[in-house]
Amino acid sequence: MRIHPPLLTAVAQCLEQIFAEGYYADKVIERAFKANKKWGVRDRKFIAENVYEIVRWWRFLWVVLDEPVNLSEYSLKKLALAYFYVSKKELEINAFVDAFRL
């Protein structure tokens, strides 16, 4: 599976709204889906699954990264990629490199 940059950005934006702005995860995901009606079933599944998992593993992932909590978009993307690595999801190796190209 490839991580496409727009999906990684969507995950990072959802995390920012959850942790920086204090919104509930389900409402953030619902708003993201309403704002992006062109996302398909797989895109929606990817975003929802991974946002919930990263919320669940939030503190552990920051320990793995060995960094203080930082809510910048770049740091949240890095956190998401750390989650993909730790969870050992089947991803293409180049997906990590491509995901950081803006």
What are these regions (language model features)?
Residues M1-L102:
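Class I Rossmann-like S-adenosyl-L-methionine
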